[in-house]
Structures are given as structure tokens and as C-alpha cells.
Amino acid sequence: MAVSCTPTLGLSSAPDEIQHPHIKFSEWKFKLFRVRSFEKTTEENQKEKNSSEGKPSLEQSPAVLDKASGQKPEVAPPAFKVHPKFSKKFHDDGKARDKAIHQANLRHLCRICGNSLKTDEHNRRYPVHGPVDSKTQGLLRKKEKKATSWPDLIAKVFRIDVKTDVDSIHPTEFCHNCWRIMHRKFSGAPCEVYFPRNATMEWHPHAPSCDICYTARRGLKRRNHQPNVQLSKKLKTVLDQARQARQRKRRVQARITSKEVMKMIANCSKIHLSTKLLAVDFPAHFVKSISCQICEHILADPVETSCKHVFCRICILRCLKVMGSYCPSCQYPCFPTDLESPVKSFLCILNSLIVKCSAPECNEEVSLEKYNHHVSSHKESRDTFVHINKGGRPRQHLLSLTRRAQKHRLRELKLQVKAFADKEEGGDVKSVCLTLFLLALRARNEHRQADELEAIMQGRGSGLQPAVCLAIRVNTFLSCSQYHKMYRTVKAITGRQIFQPLHALRNAEKVLLPGYHPFEWQPPLKNVSSSTDVGIIDGLSGLSSSVDDYPVDTIAKRFRYDSALVSALMDMEEDILEGMRSQDLEDYLNGPFTVVVKESCDGMGDVTEKHGSGPAVPEKAVRFSFTVMKITIAHGSQNVKVFEEAKPNSELCCKPLCLMLADESDHETLTAILSPLIAEREAMKSSELMLEMGGILRTFKFIFRGTGYDEKLVREVEGLEASGSVYICTLCDATRLEASQNLVFHSITRSHAENLERYEVWRSNPYHESVEELRDRVKGVSAKPFIETVPSIDALHCDIGNAAEFYKIFQLEIGEVYKNPSASKEERKRWQATLDKHLRKKMNLKPIMRMNGNFARKLMTIETVEAVCELIPSKERHEALRELMELYLKMKPVWRSSCPAKECPESLCQYSFNSQRFAELLSTKFKYRYEGKITNYFHKTLAHVPEIIERDGSIGAWASEGNESGNKLFRRFRKMNARQSKCYEMEDVLKHHWLYTSKYLQKFMNAHNAVKNSGFTMNSQVSLEDPLGIEDSLESQYSMEF
């Protein structure tokens, strides 16, 4: 390149005589290599070009001109621009250097709070993506928290997700102050820690105005003088290029060396398949995605790191052990505990790849999933001819032989294994053989089958236990056919037997259903079979039929009462033994235990189903059930309580005993079905049950309390007249007139024995009295009582009956009946329509045909009274209605609570006063309604509640609410178990309902839900029966607010 020279002033101000010629040459040299400005205009370039025409070129001119010529050589700066390629390279190198500095600064900052890690004098820092330290691990184990790494704890305590962090943006360590905050969260110990920020620390990529780098640069250091860029830029560029080339070469060599080292560490060329065996020529990117990034073979048993790189399990574990806990691809922190299985879609694609068989004589192409099996067939075929064969046809493979031939061929090996097992393993041949099989699978890299076999050896199994599957089926309301469809679908999709087949569930059912456990009665029960393996029986069994008997058109299924009680006790075995331990009683105590049983019975209305064959039965149902309320043991001179039902009104503890499609008003049918059951119950009262529980024969006595009946059914089974009778009460002999005149002061006088005596008087009429006189003598007993009930109040139906009466009072107050008692029927209907419309608008209460528990609960509130008062013009009536409702709401908890002495002691103490004031209001302000009459449940509420509480301790615990909830389950089970025969359908319903109430299955279901919801999830929901999980334990501590 020719560069023109123009005579200009020298660089030095000294005279020419004293300047050395080499100095001038050096100045000329620097001017020669100086790079001109990139912004120089075209006019300046043109001027320089014109001025250089006709001048000698650089090659033609000497280094120093003759002094005689009188000219001082001076080289004009060259007019050329830097190539864009070099400009971009300089820019990229600068950016890379800035990023490296930024990343170095990040290493000294805390990931959570952003403070500098240098401020800690002990230099305590913790890896964000590492396993928790031993102290924290011990604390988590003590608190029963399942955690092994910091990311989960950081996400829980600080609400920061660090699993997606990038090293170039986020710091990789956190400070001791944040560690102490997490430690305090889990330990609950007060300590002086604080969080220095008011918001979450946000991290951004490096930018020209980066706060992190600017903070690191500023300070009191003296700034270095910048070299003269104009003079040294070209020389510096050449040196930088040479250095970068050397670094690039070094990096490539290091990468190649690192790859070779990792391949040497993995050493898997003999067990993993090369990508050259792929049958299809896939794109390079796809091949890279399905190959291990360490050994570059096709992925075998792939695992995924937290940074989303995929490796063979053996390769990554070996590399982590030798090279440290970093990802081989991106150097991101990685630990063996972070390895997870890739997503199923990726595994499906990987397993479906077609590969060529590596055997030289085989040209088959098989899927990767079946490759091991295919190759093993080659080995087996080769091994077929290895054995000594003294002529004849070739030896057949072992698996193709009959069982007898297999025994003959393996006889010598079997003897050797037996000798080894006897010598080393105590004769456990099975464990030795399973372990050999397990090692063979591991050696052939078939880890999935090996894991399943190992789980079976440990008793866990690869899937769920049959009891867990049964609990899932029962609690999700799946019939057998629906469960079987789900089982087949899951097995076909996953290839694993996660759920157990139906026959395994039926084996688990047998243990839980009545008729499995042996027992004995001392003395034996009268008129009851001594056999114990009795399951579901027909409701009419044991009924002696004759031509004159009442023809029973019904379908009934039941358990035998004693067998059902034994099954219920064995289902509660763990609870009973745990209760004994909690009372510091020895496990070997054999009793006698006293079991208190609540009995419930209720009729159901329309249960019509449009299917099933069988007799024409009424589409109404009756259910008889029982609940084990309390179990005590005689210890010394006192009875110690070892079990008490925590939720006595739950449908989960109300066990069905008898189901029948019959009308509860049909006295003959009801008597025919329930009489054998009542006979068993009467026989059990005078005998003791001998049952083996916990390996010890124990003695049980039973106390039966029939309290879960509504008033209609009590009158039916106790032989009393219907609820419209003049004898208003099932607890005392008061008539309706007597009860209205004396609202409060009555005592309980009726009993089952007295009713039986009165029935005999009614039947025989020994005094030869008239009907009216006889009726007055027996106080309303008109039929033979056949079920013994406890004189009590059913809390649920008491609420419903009282709410219906208040609903009527609201209508009468709207119509101002206290002024005009003689209102027509049309006017009364208009008042009801007005009330319904207003309640729907104000209280969102939709009108119903018949009062139910939910409507009663919503209706009986102060808000409802306020809404009704808007329709009543008189202020005085407002006050009377409000006071009546307030008194009722003060009295209601006494008969609704399970233990009023603990739950509402004040209301219990004030009950007598409140009931007298309530009665006074009825007889004065509401005299138009209650003069000479009163409703059945108002009478029981005002007169008998304190006496029942004093006798039983509670009314609410003995209510029929659990049985009412069971009625809803009956409808659901019946729809679910629809079969062609109604007879079998009732068996399915009874069996499914019994399993639904099993405490054993409920524990399995709770444990299954706890495992499913465990882990550090942001919105985990723990079942109510579970102990406090980590979510609750964290939230109950101090709330972490930034």
C-alpha cells in the first residue's frame, strides 16, 4: 500500500542539529501506524488524496532525507478504515469481559437479601442449590419435615423460586443472616434476626448502568491514567487477537480433554448404545437431544438435572462423584438428590426409537425399549449350544422346558444354592434367589425391573397396597366394574400395575366385613347360631312362615348383630390399644371392656329406581344402624375410658346393620324384619363376648341405647299412638292441655317396661273399663312395643320441629292474627307466599315443601327475624318476636352440643331461667297460638332438656344426624351399584356402606392423601384428620413479610 508523505513540522521542538535521526524515524513510524478517526468526512479524504499526488511513495523514499535538500521528512497519517469484522470482535470481547466482572461481583452477594458476603467475619456462606447443612437437616428431621436441599426451603420461607436461576444473573450463595431466618422459622425459637429489605430482591442481567458493577467500582481508589489510545490502538489490537486465539485454542483443548476425561470416568462403552445404531438418520440436533452429554451414547435410564440437562444415570453419578457437584454441561451446582426422571412424553419418544441390533448375524431393527430383551435372546441362543451335548438333538432352552424338566436340569444348582443359604443366610433360599435375580437385572442395565423387584422384596410392591386401593375405590364411590375399567386403563397406559386387581381388593374386603373374625359368647346366645363366619344374610331369615302369616313383600339385607359388632371392634383394634397405652394401662389387660352402642333407625321417602327385577316392593326404605360411642375398661374400682367417638354424628362412624325396601308405617313388615335383629340384641345383653384382640383373649360387655329415632318412629316401635294424639309426649304422660297449662315443670316417667305392662292392660282389659277409661289408664299405648328405646329427644328433629313452628309464627305475625284470629284459608296462603318471597329476597332462602335441617339452621337466626319484622307494622310485636328468637338461640346450644358442660356452660346454667321466660312469652304475647295447646317439640324443649342432660350428659351426641347423613349415602350407593337384581343390589349397597365406615380404611385414605399432598408446595391441602403439616407449622409461626 503506497502512502504519500508531506513535509510538515516535526514532532520535536528541538533544533535539527541536536536531534538524532532514529528519533525522527520512530516518530514517523508511530504516525505511519496511527489510525485515523472513523468520522472523517469525504472532503478531507479527497483533500489528502489531492495533496499527496506527485509525491514519492514510501517504498521509493529513504528513511532519512538528505540534509542538503533542506526538507524534513514527515509521513501523513494513512487514510483507511478498520474492517467491520474487527470492530465487532472488539465490541464482543468488551461485553464478555464486562459479564465476567459482573459475575465475579455476584459471587460476593447474597442471593436472598442482596447484602455482601464479605461482611461476615467468619466467612459463613451457603450454596443456594446445595443440600442443607447437618444442623438444619437435624432440625428438619426433628420437626418431621421431608427436605434435603435449600431451594425448597427458600421457596417456602422467602417465597423465592431459585430453581430457575442463571449464574450470569443470580448469585449462587446466601448469607448467614438469611440462614438464621430460615432456622428460626423451623425451630420456633426467638432470636434476634432481621431481614434488611422491604421487598424481594430483584436480579437483572448485566447492563451499561448496572447497579452491582457501579457499586463495586466506586470508592476512594485513585483512577489510573488512560494510555494514549491514538498511539497504541493498533498494537494493542494485534496483541489482543493473538491472546484470544491462544485462549480459544486452550479452551477447545480443555473442553476436548474434559470430554475425554468424563468419558473415561463414565467408562460405559460396553453397556450403552452408540448413536450410530439408530435405524433412522435423524437431524444432528435431535440426536444430540436423545444422547447423553457425557458419553455421547443413546440415553440409558435417563435422569434430568435441575438445570434441565439430561444424562445417563450411571454417567452423571460417576462424574458427580469424581469431578464434584456441578453439571458437566453448564457447571451449574448439581447434587445426586436433585436428579429426577424426565417427563413421560420424552421417555415415550426415547423408548420408541428404532435401533439396529449390534449382533453381526442379525439385521433386525427393534425399539429401544425392547432392545435388551432382543439381545438377550441372541445370548440365550448362543448359550444353547455351549453345554456339553453328547449327541442327539440340540438341548432346548431352559425357559422352553416343562417344569419337571427345569427341576431336573437345575437340580445341581438348586442343591448348591440351598447349601449356601443354609450356611450363610439361615436357610433363606428365596432371598438368595431373589438377590441373584436382582443383581442379574442390574448387570444388564434393566434398572426399572430391578427397582420393582426390590420393592417387592421389601414388602412395598411397585404399586399401591390392596387396602389403599380399596380405600380409594370406596371413598371415590366406584363400583367394582368402574374400578376394574380404571385399573385396566392405568395399567395399559403406564405399563405398571399401580392399582391392584379386583381379586386382591376382595381379599382385603373379607378381613373388614363381618363374618371373618372368630369369637365366642359366654354363655352362648339364646336362639342365635354359634357359627361365626356369617356375612350378609337375608332380612327375612329366621322368620318362621306359615299360611296365615302376613305376606311380606319386601327386600331386606342385613348382618347378624353380634358378628357386625365383632367386626366393628376389630376395625377399631388400633384405637383401643392406643387408648389403653395413653391411659398408662398394660396391653395384656383382658377386661372386661364395656361398649356403649348408639342405635339409630329412620325411614326414607321416595327411593324409586328405574331398573332392576324382583318383587313389586314399595319404593321406600328403612335403615337400621349403630355407632360405637364409648369403650371403658374396669381397672381397680373405677372404669377407665379407652375410646370415645370424637364425631358421634358423622356418617363415617354410623355403621349400617340392616337395609330394607319397606314403608316404616307398615307395622307388620317392620316387625317381621327387625324382630330377629332385636332378639339378637336382647340375647347379647346378658352374655359376654370373648374376642382375641392384639393376641390376647379379651372380654366385652355391651350397653345398647336406642336414641337415634325421630318421634314418628319412636311412637311406632314403642306402641304409642301417632304424634297427633292427645298424649303429646313420648317421655311423660302429659296430655296436650296439661302441657299447655304447665309448660315447664314435667319429669320423664315413660319406659319400655312400663309400655309393655300397659299394652298387656290394653290387650286384656282386666278391669272391664270402657274404651275411653281404658285409653286414659294406658296413656296412649295401643300396640305392642317391640324395640326398646331410651326416653330422650332427638336434637336434629327437635330443631326441625321448632323451626317449622317458628315458620308458622312468622306467617301469623304477618297476618296480625293476634288482632283478627278468624282469617280465611286464602288469606293464610297469601301470608305464606309473602313470607316465602321476602325470605328468598332477603335471606336467599328458597321455599321448600317440607322442613329440613339445612333450612331450619338458616331460618333460626336473628337476621331472619329482622327481615320478617319488615313485614310487621307493630313495633311491640317486633320486640316480642326478637326476644322469642334470642331466648331460643340461647337455649339451642344446650341440646345441640356434644358436651354442653364443656362447650356452653353458661347456656346450661341459664337454661331453666330462659325456658321459663320463653314459656311466659308463649302464654302472654303469643296466647292466640298457644292457649290450650302446644307443639310436641316445644313441650320437650321446655320441660325435659335439663333432666336428660343431667342423666346422659348430652343430647346432641346421641342424635340421629349420622343416620340421616347415611340416608344420603344410601341413595348414592344405590345409584352406583345398579344391578339387574334388586336383591344383589342391596347386598352391594350394604357391603359398600360398611366399608365406607371402616376406620381402618379411613386411616389408609388419610395416609394416602397426606403422601399425595406432602412436599413443599405453595397450595398444599392437608386432610383434616392429619397432624399439622409443614404448611400449617410454618404459617402458625411468624409471618415473613418483606
Curated annotation (Swiss-Prot):
Keywords: Chromatin regulator, DNA recombination, DNA-binding, Endonuclease, Hydrolase, Isopeptide bond, Metal-binding, Multifunctional enzyme, Nuclease, Nucleus, Transferase, Ubl conjugation, Ubl conjugation pathway, Zinc, Zinc-finger. Residues 391-458 bind DNA. CDD domains: RING-HC_RAG1. Its cofactor is Mg(2+); Mn(2+). It is found in: Nucleus. InterPro entries: RAG1, RAG1_imp-bd, RAG1_Znf, RAG_nonamer-bd_dom, Znf_C2H2_sf, Znf_C3HC4_RING-type, Znf_RING, Znf_RING/FYVE/PHD. The keyword RNA-binding does not apply. SMART domains: RING (SM00184). Residues 40-80 are annotated as: Disordered. GO terms for cellular component: DNA recombinase complex; endodeoxyribonuclease complex; nucleus. Autoubiquitinated in the presence of CDC34/UBCH3. It comes from the Eukaryota. Zn(2+) 2 binds at C292, C295, C312, C315. The record marks W895 as: Essential for DNA hairpin formation, participates in base-stacking interactions near the cleavage site. Catalytic component of the RAG complex, a multiprotein complex that mediates the DNA cleavage phase during V(D)J recombination. V(D)J recombination assembles a diverse repertoire of immunoglobulin and T-cell receptor genes in developing B and T-lymphocytes through rearrangement of different V (variable), in some cases D (diversity), and J (joining) gene segments. In the RAG complex, RAG1 mediates the DNA-binding to the conserved recombination signal sequences (RSS) and catalyzes the DNA cleavage activities by introducing a double-strand break between the RSS and the adjacent coding segment. This is V(D)J recombination-activating protein 1.
